[in-house]
């Protein structure tokens, strides 16, 4: 059984496992910086399951920022029928690649 945590980060609920890499919405920090997620909604260890109300207390997820990157381009096309108006726009979402170092449970 693997350890994992469900964390509220960058406006979403994300499933984190130690030692894995994830792309999340942009975090204002430099590559190489360490970040800590405190808003843990659920923690699963080998022998226990902790569910928060709404967050699990004294649990934190430690991660390292590896790099900032852009996602694939999303194209938005607007058109008004019978008017001849067309607009084509596109954007690339800026993401941050992180590595989950460990999940600390200070409740033990």
UniProtKB/Swiss-Prot annotation:
Where in the chain are disulfide-linked cysteines found?
none
A Gene Ontology annotation in the biological process aspect, one of them, is: translation
Instruction: Tell me the compartments it is located in.
Output: Plastid, Chloroplast
What molecular function does GO assign, one term? Answer: rRNA binding
Q: Where is it mostly found?
A: plastid
A cellular component annotation (GO) from this entry: chloroplast
Q: Which domain of life is it from?
A: Eukaryota
Question: InterPro entries in the record, alphabetically?
Answer: bL21-like (IPR028909), bL21-like_sf (IPR036164), Ribosomal_bL21 (IPR001787), Ribosomal_bL21_CS (IPR018258)
Pfam short name (any one): Ribosomal_L21p
Q: Which UniProt keywords apply?
A: Chloroplast, Plastid, Ribonucleoprotein, Ribosomal protein, RNA-binding, rRNA-binding
Task: Please give the HAMAP family that the UniProt record associates with this protein.
Answer: Ribosomal_bL21
The family database entries (NCBIfam families) matched by this protein are listed as: L21
Family affiliation: Belongs to the bacterial ribosomal protein bL21 family.
Main role?
Answer: This protein binds to 23S rRNA.
| Known partners and oligomeric status | Part of the 50S ribosomal subunit.
Instruction: Name the chain's protein.
Output: Large ribosomal subunit protein bL21c
Organism expressing this protein natively:
Cyanidium caldarium (Red alga)
Lineage at the top is: Eukaryota, Rhodophyta, Bangiophyceae, Cyanidiales, Cyanidiaceae
């Amino acid at each position: 059984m693997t350890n994992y945590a469900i964390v509220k980060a960058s406006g979403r609920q994300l499933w984190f496992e130690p030692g894995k890499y994830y792309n999340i919405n942009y975090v204002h920090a430099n590559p190489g910086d360490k970040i800590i997620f405190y808003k843990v909604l659920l923690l699963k260890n080998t022998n226990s399951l902790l569910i928060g109300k709404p967050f699990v207390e004294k649990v934190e997820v430690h991660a390292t920022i590896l790099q900032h990157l852009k996602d694939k381009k999303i194209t938005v096309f607007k058109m008004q029928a019978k008017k001849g108006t067309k607009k084509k726009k596109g954007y690339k979402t800026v993401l941050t690649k992180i590595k989950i170092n460990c999940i600390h449970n200070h409740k033990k």
